[in-house]
């Protein structure tokens, strides 16, 4: 990157830390303020934070790869999670039901649901440990994916890029809890939205896809195979019942496309009927009222819809790149995103784009860590290890738990 791009990224990172630290005083009263913002955060802040947390670099790269290789069929595959259909259940039913429980975590909900006897204790402990393990796994996924992407553009090793983002995000997450998380997410959401508008505008004004073109799919042996597709097939709105991916392709599992989509839809329905978990559920526990739980869902979903024009635009620019005689078809679909940024984003704008994608990574990371730490403090430490712990002690445990989760 050029010097101006690096300056933009550095200024952005410093601004994020400052915004987060400003919220430290509000989050230092007790664990309710640290993990739920005293249940006084506006619905639009919680909704914007949710959108930012749902948008991460690794997920954007994977979804772009699907759309690039499969067209709109990739969108249907992401019914498994990327489309976040679970928000429909949260908006209509589960969001307000979870908020009414007045609990802090999904594990504490187990006591609310099954009682405080042996069954409830068992369910709560299992839920707490499972949630902590999942938090560590998700943090690892986010950090590795973001580190590879950011390291390439900053010109440093992926491990150092990951470490940079982790240290900065942990600075305000540990200090200011959910207050710092949601307000920095709002700030980062502005960057993300700016990126969406710019890339979508560029794709619409630059790209005209021909009737037939080549894309590429990954193979099980690590190689890649170029395949021909048509514009009508790539952009068809209705999903087919079957696909014809090459034998030995990692996408071959989707050849029985209709069955795969029905399975994912059934899976999301089951998950939605039982409510979400992690940082998604935390936003509803923090809502001020049933009405605001519904409003934050609507706002969250509306903002998240803009993620897909961004992903489709990156995919279109990736195909456009392969049509250029100076280049060849992008072999690895997961390299579409960095390739487009490298070849099509001008100096200055590239700095804002990298900052926006770093914002997406950090917002997902900080939300996951803050929600995960609550399981240790509320469900294990306060409930079973030190029931009479002071608020000061619980706050200390919350900060230590955040650090330990990242260290693992």
Segments (PLM) and residue ranges:
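Extracellular loop-to-transmembrane helix junctions
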Residues: 2-24, 37, 45, 65-108, ...
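Helix-loop-helix module between adjacent transmembrane segments
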Residues: 52, 75-174, 245, 263-271, ...
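Loop-to-transmembrane helix boundary motifs in multi-pass membrane proteins
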Residues: 113-128, 132, 136, 377-408
